[in-house]
Structure formats: structure tokens, C-alpha cells
Amino acid sequence: MYNGQKLYISDVTLRDGMHAIRHQYSIDQAVAIAKALDDAKVDSIEVAHGDGLRGSSFNYGFGAHSDLEWIEAVASVLKHARVATLLLPGIGTLHDLDAAFKAGVRTVRVATHCTEADVSRQHIEHARKLGMDTVGFLMMSHMTSPQILAQQAKLMENYGAECIYVVDSGGALSMQQVADRFKAFKDVLKPETQTGMHAHHNLALGVANSIVAVENGCDRIDASLAGMGAGAGNAPLEVFIATADRMGWNHGTDLFGLMNAADDLVRPLQDRPVRVDRETLALGYAGVYSSFLRHAEAASARYGIAAVDILVELGRRRMVGGQEDMIVDVALDLIKTRQRTTGTSGVAA
């Protein structure tokens, strides 16, 4: 049950939301969104390329600006919220973390695949030495059992992480599965170690799963304005806050300020609607990394293979974050299969 303590509200519009617009926020847009979030009194605002520090690349897509340009601009206008960022070991380095800290970042979420927490040790330990609020971020949490996930969380705690997240990168978890994972966390983590929930809305459960997480002892909730994020988006921040408000939970934010920011600042930027539709539902159904969506749609347009077919096959092969290069391989394999079964040339003109 909810323990009555103030929830920590972590906004991800300027990081996960990057995926929805191919990492193309302008500095002015990022600053306007950050100011609105700060005025609404969220606790932290995550800023980075969608794939974290140093994510701008051929594999993930190039950003309109560097991480440091976005971070410095946002940090310069905040009066309440702290600046957070995301780091994936193997993409971002300790040098990138140092630079982000100097630019104003005070919270870092060190993200690994749900069974690879051991690669986070160096980065978590370094963040603690810098005095940062240090979070372990276990992505694709649906791909392993609650007990194994909890063991991975314990590793991150041992390295120095002060909060560990269940990260539903594929938007594939049910409410019971969320509850089971938080119960497993509470069984092994120290009482003082916080827990967090990062939901995606691919099965339209982003808010529901966040509510269930809080009811099972979760301290921090990730959400984004208008759900701005990969796939069908994250839990929409304004919807979660409205629900929390009706439930009498202490969140400390301005609901109507968030509602205005979602509709006036964020929704107009969506060149592809962030919603549950045929393709994003396929992500949740197949348990596919949500940021694969735009890459799969590009491959679909290029090769004439339905994006849903590509996404379902990616799920069957259990592809994970970092394997974006395999999306084209899957599309080409599906063309070969179609050629064998129909005798057609396969590739669209």
C-alpha cells in the first residue's frame, strides 16, 4: 500500500521523449519545456539523447544538439528541479559522466539490460564518488523473472546505487507482473534503498502499472508530458498526476501546469502521434524495445515489409536495446521468406 510519503516525480520528456521526434528538440524547445516542468515542481528532469549520453550515432540516430548543449541550457533555467541524465555503459563513458556533472547534472541513471547489471559497477561507483544521486536502471525488465531481476538489483545496490528501477522498456508488463517485481525487490534490497518505475504505454498500462508500483512500495515514478517517449510513449505525466491526486497521494506538483505544458508545448512537436496504434501495440505484444519503433517504420518504408511483421519477428528473436542494426537484417530475412513462399521479388519499387 501507498506509505503516505511524497512521491518523487521524475520527468523524462527531454530524454525518452527524444525518441518520438528522432532526437531533434531545439534548444529553445528544451528550455521552454524544462521551465514549465520546473514551474510545476517536478523533482527531476532527465536530459540527454534518447539513448543516453553519447547516444548520437549512426546506430541510434544523430541528435540536433550535443548532450552537453541540451544539459547546459536546461540547467541554466531551473530553480527547483534537479537535472538528471541517462548513461548506458558501452555507449556513455566516465569522461561523459564527468562532463555532464560539470554541466549541471546531479542525478544519473545507469542503465543496463535486465540481466547485465554487472557492467554498471564502474559507472555507479564513479557517480557516487562525484556525489551524484545514483540510480540503477534495469531495462527490458519483462525479459527475466522477478527473482532474477531482484538479484540484479542487489548487484547495483552493492555497487552503490541508491535507487533501483523496474524499467518496462517494451511496455509489456501486466499489473501483476509489476507487483511481483517490486515485491521481489523489497525482499532483497535494504530498507533505505529506494525503488522506481519506468513504464511504457504500449499496452495502454503505463499509468496503471505506475499506480500498482506505488501501491507496492515504489518511491520514484518516471513519466513524460503527453506521454512523449519511445513507442506509445511513457506514462503520461499529467494523467498519472491527476490519478495520484484523486487517490490522495502526495506528489507536490501543479496538475494544471502540467496539463497546459503537455498540450501547448509537447503535443504539437509530435511528427508521429505518440499513442497506442497498430505498430506500438505490436511492441507491447511482442515485448520489443520501444525505441525500435521509428527504426522499424523506416525499414518498412524502405523494403515494403509491414512494420508489425518486423516488430513481431524482433520479439520472437528476443532482440534487446543496442541491436538496432538487426532491424534491417530482420526486414531482409522476411523478404527472403516471402520470396520463397510467393515467388515474388520481395523488395518494393
Curated annotation (Swiss-Prot):
It catalyses: (S)-4-hydroxy-2-oxopentanoate = acetaldehyde + pyruvate. Keywords: Aromatic hydrocarbons catabolism, Lyase, Manganese, Metal-binding, Plasmid. GO terms for molecular function: 2-isopropylmalate synthase activity; 4-hydroxy-2-oxovalerate aldolase activity; manganese ion binding. The record marks 15 as: Transition state stabilizer. GO terms for biological process: catabolic process; L-leucine biosynthetic process. It is an enzyme of class 4 (lyase). This is 4-hydroxy-2-oxovalerate aldolase. It comes from Polaromonas sp. (strain JS666 / ATCC BAA-500).
